[in-house]
Swiss-Prot record:
InterPro entries: POLR3C_WHD, RNA_pol_III_RPC82-rel_HTH, RNA_pol_III_Rpc82_C, RPC3, WH-like_DNA-bd_sf. Residues 429-444 have a biased composition (Acidic residues). Present with 2520 molecules/cell in log phase SD medium. Residues 581-602 are annotated as: Leucine-zipper. This is DNA-directed RNA polymerase III subunit RPC3. The modification Phosphoserine is found at S392, S394. The gene is RPC82. Gene3D superfamilies: Winged helix-like DNA-binding domain superfamily/Winged helix DNA-binding domain. Residues 381-401, 422-448 are annotated as: Disordered. Transmembrane segments: none annotated. The lineage of its organism: Eukaryota, Fungi, Dikarya, Ascomycota, Saccharomycotina.
Length: 654
């Protein structure tokens, strides 16, 4: 499969020159002459990615990334022409650093004349690793199963931090600076755990290859392999080439995740170790699965309660590693623009969720992993209040004089004696109470009993939100393909309600439920004043949550003869919200860097070795107050950035 990927990297692309010519139509002045504020507002992706790269790699790297985001793929020569103050050597040096951190992908193309040109693309995966770097370390430390908590967690943090800082590393290089044999054994076992949990994977050419170009090469290869004299129609040829390309594409994509390519057995100790020469890198998709689980747990907590959400947390963690990817690579190939392909992709995703081994579970599976401090006893109602009313009603009915029964010949059947009737009733009540007591005792014996866990799973499966699906009695799986759109909708409504008010959320729901509505229908269903409805609609339209559609009633297209209807287009709304949150995150990073620049002299003085720890003695009172203000504002930025990040990532997930 490496040979196949190698062919893709060195494949001849006859359209390379025409693509370059079309890109030359956009001059550097079109981007660089825009004022700073306008440029940041027009392209939130550019604003965020430049600020992130600037904070980690400096101004030159930010300029290169900015050009790649704004103009698309570029060669070294084109980058030199478009960026002032950078020559060929500086551009190449910067590209090496960006490529090492997986912020840039590249592809070599051969023109008709035989000239080879390497084009560079920005890679959002590497930039997102920089964005999540601290959270990645924290998440992995939380999920790792270690014996000595403090020492081993510190070692894990150092390993992950080194991998993020260098982009990739081998175990052999990492252990070269370790002298103790026991420490080498410990670190080697931690590397094995990280690989088994999926947080570290083998780095390959795939991480530096544009997905769109890889798919295009595979598709064209299989299409050309079909004989020209084949009796198949062109439509069937394309369909067959597409199926074969999908198979090869899946093999290439999944190869870095295969443990057999990473782990081996040490002949000396007979223990599993990571191959010393294999380069390892961070698996961002594995980390994002954990972030997705957290979002779903928070959603379950608001819908079905905290105890049931804890049971749901165990179910998600149990199946998290084998769960579907956050964003399937096929969605980045442009293949899903075809409606039939999109529908078949959705159906296939639902089938994979149900049939993949390791994604289904039952109550017994969860009972083995429930924490000891979680007690499920008393978390469910053992008897409905209506049962008491029914029982008291039946007793009252029994106390009333019963209707006399007669035989065919007119003989009246006498009622039972009062003593006998009373004894039968008491025995029946005693039997019911004994049965109830037995049920309650069964629940109170084991805090993690299968019956209690199964009851919580049924609550999740019967909720209006599809947290779980039941394939067969007692066996469940998480329907991510159905649940993620619900999560997006819920978070979007939360943001709208918290920023524009509950009335905006009510109108948004009303329009979305009715698809296409007029103002008259909104007035009759929203139960709000007409003045409030119009002002709220104006706010929703400004935030791209609601769109206006003109429907002419006659051939005359004047506005006075048209009807204006309202509708919600979720794709546009979510994209606008994502860009809005993205811009706010970038603006926070921009303000943080600006704050550091304004106080650079004070920060340099405070970070000197002879001043650290003696600030109260060596700094003036005004400098101490200024330093305290800078630190507080920086902490405030990180807190706000964390909240924005948790909202933004929901709209990033497919």
């Amino acid at each position: 499969m490496d040979e196949l990927l190698g062919e893709a990297l060195s494949a001849e692309n006859q359209t390379g020159e025409s693509t370059v010519e079309s890109e030359k139509l956009v001059t550097p002045e079109d981007v660089m002459t825009i004022s700073s504020l306008e440029q940041r507002t027009l392209n939130p992706d550019l604003f965020l990615y430049k600020e992130l790269v600037k904070a980690h790699l400096g101004e030159r790297a930010a300029s290169v990334i900015g050009m790649l985001v704004a103009l698309g793929r570029l060669s070294v020569r084109e980058l030199v022409e478009k960026i002032d103050g950078m020559d060929v050597d500086s551009v190449k040096t910067t590209l090496v650093s960006l490529t090492q951190l997986r912020c840039v992908k590249y592809l070599q193309e051969t023109a008709i004349s035989g000239k080879k040109t390497t084009y560079y693309y920005y890679n959002e995966e590497g930039i997102h690793i920089l964005l999540y770097s601290g959270l990645i370390i924290d998440e992995i430390i939380t999920q790792m199963r270690v014996n000595d908590e403090e020492e081993h967690k510190q070692l894990v943090a150092e390993i992950v931090q080194n991998v993020i800082s260098l982009g990739s590393l081998t175990v052999e290089d990492y252990l070269s600076s370790v002298t103790s044999d026991s420490m080498k054994y410990t670190i080697s076992s931690l590397f094995v755990q990280l690989c088994e949990m999926g947080y570290l994977i083998q780095i390959s050419k795939l991480h530096y290859t544009p997905i769109e170009d890889l798919w295009q090469f595979l598709y064209e290869k299989h299409y050309k392999n079909i004989p020209r004299n084949s009796p198949l129609s062109d439509l069937k040829k394309r369909s067959q080439a597409k199926m074969n390309a999908k198979t090869d594409f899946a093999k290439i994509i999944n190869k870095p995740n295969e443990l057999s390519q990473i782990l081996t057995v040490d002949p000396k100790t007979s223990l599993r170790i990571v191959k010393p020469t294999v380069s390892l890198t961070i698996n961002l998709d594995r980390f994002m699965k954990g972030r997705r689980s957290k979002q779903l747990i928070n959603l379950a907590k608001t819908r079905v309660g905290s105890v049931t959400a804890q049971v749901y947390k165990i179910a998600l963690r149990l199946t998290e590693q084998k769960s579907p990817k956050i964003r399937d690579p096929l969605t980045q190939t442009g293949l899903l623009q075809d409606l039939e392909e999109a529908k078949s992709f959705q159906d296939e995703a639902e089938l994979v969720e149900e049939k993949t081994p390791g994604l289904t579970f039952n109550a017994i599976d969860l009972a083995r992993h429930l924490p000891a401090e979680l007690d499920l006893r008393g978390s469910l109602l053992s008897r409905k209040p209506s049962d008491n009313k029914k029982r008291s009603g039946s007793n009252a009915a029994a106390s009333l004089p019963s209707k006399k029964l007669k035989t065919e010949d007119g003989f009246v059947i006498p009622a039972l004696p009062a003593a006998v009737s009373k004894s039968l009733q008491e025995s029946g009540d005693t039997q019911e109470e004994d049965e109830e007591e037995e049920d309650l005792d069964a629940d109170t014996e084991d805090p993690h009993s299968a019956s209690l866990i199964n009851s919580h799973l049924k609550i999740l499966a019967s909720s209006n939100f599809p947290f779980l699906n039941e394939t067969k009695p007692g066996v469940y799986y998480v329907p991510y393909s159905k649940l993620m759109p619900v999560l997006k909708s819920s978070v979007y409504e939360y943001v709208i309600a918290s920023t524009l008010g509950p009335s905006a959320m009510r109108l948004s729901r009303c329009i979305r439920d009715n698809k296409l509505v007029s103002e008259k229908i909104i007035n009759s269903t929203a139960l709000m004043k007409e003045k409030d409805i119009r002002s709220t609609l104006a706010s929703l339209i400004r935030y791209n949550s609601v769109e206006i559609q003109e429907v002419p009633r006659t051939a005359d297209r004047s506005a006075s003869r048209a009807v204006f209807l309202f509708r919600c287009k979720e794709t546009h709304s979510y994209n606008f919200m994502r860009q809005n949150l993205e811009w706010n995150m970038a603006n926070l990073l921009f303000k943080k860097e600006k704050l550091k620049q304004e106080n650079s002299t004070l920060l340099k003085k405070a970070n000197r070795d002879d001043v650290k720890g003696r600030e109260n003695e060596l700094l003036l009172p005004s400098e101490l107050n200024q330093l305290k203000m800078v630190n507080e504002r920086e902490l405030n930025v990180f807190a706000r950035l964390s909240r924005l990040l948790s909202l933004w990532e929901v709209f990033q997930m497919a």
